[in-house]
Amino acid sequence: MKNINPSQTAAWQALQTHFDAMKDVKISELFAQDSDRFAHFSATFDDQMLVDYSKNRITAETMGKLHALARETDLPAAIHAMFAGEKINRTEDRAVLHVALRNRSNTPILVDGKDVMPEVNAVLAKMKDFSERVIGGEWKGYTGKTITDVVNIGIGGSDLGPFMVTEALKPYKNHLNMHFVSNVDGTHIAETLKPLNPETTLFLVASKTFTTQETMTNAHSARDWFLKTAQDEKHVAKHFAALSTNAKAVGEFGIDTNNMFEFWDWVGGRYSLWSAIGLSIILSLGFDNFEKLLSGAHAMDKHFASTPAEKNLPVLLALIGIWYNNFFGAETEAILPYDQYMHRFAAYFQQGNMESNGKSTDRNGNPVDYQTGPIIWGEPGTNGQHAFYQLIHQGTKLVPCDFIAPATSHNPLSDHHSKLLSNFFAQTEALAFGKSREVVEAEFTAAGKSAKEVEHVAPFKVFEGNRPTNSILLRDITPYSLGALIALYEHKIFTQGAILNIFTFDQWGVELGKQLANRILPELESDSTIDSHDSSTNGLINRFKAWRN
């Protein structure tokens, strides 16, 4: 990967000049000028997904200049470097190969000259065997009962991805009840365990190093809870499995290392649901559905690696995001899935994007002089419409939005889905085109309102419009289409990081707080007054000590 400051490129300067001409252009004008705008600014993927980006403040010239930026920062070489197993995570000296985990073509992918696919396939086969024994009832707990509940204990990438996928694909779930514990707050593990039976519960401890503080604290509490009933530590092996690479620590915990599922340092946490971290997905949905999830992602991988930039969906969405973030000053992006099963999708990519591209140092080690990762947030529609859409429609912040919906519902009750999708279509139309003062006044007049009433209220009912959106319409939410959708966003994030000259696959920003917490924890053991920090931190710790007693 080349280390090029994007803001110093000719393409960036051309975009700045172009922005000056575009900043006051209305989306409504762009549609008026081009009756085929939808056809010109939309694309389909695999007859499963339609991406409509026509309701953006862009023209063909805009896209041409954005593509020039991608070429000048050598995006094609960056894409090739990732797929070739080069160590593009330079600060940790690691390759970045989540694409290998779903490489259904099984073509060789080399790291340090060694094909990783045999090991990937071996772990998949091991997970298949384990999951079939648990799901089929062959795996028994210590009293001979079959497993009814599975608790995944992990945090960050070891929790967010599996939780999101098992929720999104809940229509495909089997009889096993899935639970996810992440927070070190004891309430999370305590409330999860309350209704469970130790004799029929299986725990998955997801920690690559088997040292993650939150995860291991919860794992030891789960083990203590289990042993209160089981009494004998030898029974731990029947009720705990590990998603880890630390065989020594796993064995010391009491887990049979035959039930330890490994992954590799080229798997980043927030890209790990495709790895052994996805064992909870397999236990919930079955191995066949997990394979379909992998296949959908692999299809998007092939699209990303081989499709020209002008038709490459992750590249298109990435470039449009850079356009708003760096030229319009938009600081956030909203992800708005019109599907209740997808209620964790925005939270998943909040981590995926913000932990990846929330960087202020470029690949040369210099402070950046441009915007990098945006703030990601969102909720399912139509809930969001009754919560925060007011600001998106009429506030002073520009919030580009991704609207996501399936054409077919898993729960076709009455006319629920038609009503849901009518809101999906209406919101993007309203955001783009708004409502003028003239239309508002005409509506008031038609309703018999007086001129005074019109003058008094009309200004507050005007919608400026010109709020940009992408619409992503899926045939339905299946393991395959969800896999493709997740990979679409992953590659969008990668593309933006590559162009913006930052390291997308490290996360040093999470480390300082951990270090300080490890220093503070021993200070909380006694009731003595603390004075080793700043006055604020000292004051908070000392008040905590006074109040906890």
From Swiss-Prot:
* GO cellular component terms attached to this protein's record: cytosol
Among the Pfam families in the record, one is PGI
Q: What pathway is it annotated to? A: Carbohydrate biosynthesis; gluconeogenesis; Carbohydrate degradation; glycolysis; D-glyceraldehyde 3-phosphate and glycerone phosphate from D-glucose: step 2/4
Give GO BP annotations, semicolon-separated. Answer: gluconeogenesis; glucose 6-phosphate metabolic process; glycolytic process
Membership in a protein family = Belongs to the GPI family.
The protein's role, per its UniProt record: Catalyzes the reversible isomerization of glucose-6-phosphate to fructose-6-phosphate.
| The name this protein goes by in its record | Glucose-6-phosphate isomerase
Q: Which organism is it from?
A: Pectobacterium atrosepticum (strain SCRI 1043 / ATCC BAA-672)
